[in-house]
Amino acid sequence: MPDAGPGALIDLFVGAIKLDRETYRRVAGRPESTRLCIAIVLLSGLAHGAVLTMRWGPAGGPIVGIASAFASLGLSSLLVWLIGVVLLRYPSGFGSIVRPLAIAAAPALFNLVGALTLVRPVVLVVSAWLLAAFLVAVRAALDCGRLVALGVTLATWAVELSMYYYALRD
């Protein structure tokens, strides 16, 4: 996989949405692919921002979408690192965790289809797809088996949900 250009980004995007384990493993071990991974998060944030703009109007939708995409990536990466590296002792650097989790955001681009067509099942399918991509990314990031990746994914998800719940309750 080349490190720059639209062809490389498209190849990375296609590998990510196909849940190609080799694509996720490759970016985990290649710091030079960081820019492409950031581009995937940026695009997913723009897609989220477009959906927010359709719901709230133009005031800040893209900015909020991009900010939330990068904040989510940061939080998820930190949680996977804490659980996988610190707690379970899997030898992995932080960058090797961030990059696969970044491309796991690729299916979020399809939320635009759900927003444009107002078809709720699309959003549900994309949500399941994102969870599956996250699982593949965790497995590549920690170089672990399916059960460990599932455990780390579920633990990360539980912590994130509880944080969102406590942040939004009043």
For the regions a protein language model found, what residue spans apply to each?
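Selected alpha-helical membrane-embedding segments in polytopic membrane proteins
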Residues: 2-95
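Alpha-helix boundary/interfacial micro-motifs
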Residues: 37-38, 107, 162, 170
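Transmembrane helix-loop junctions in multi-pass membrane proteins
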Residues: 47-60, 109-118, 165-169
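Hydrophobic alpha-helical transmembrane segments and adjacent short intramembrane/lumenal linkers
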Residues: 81-165
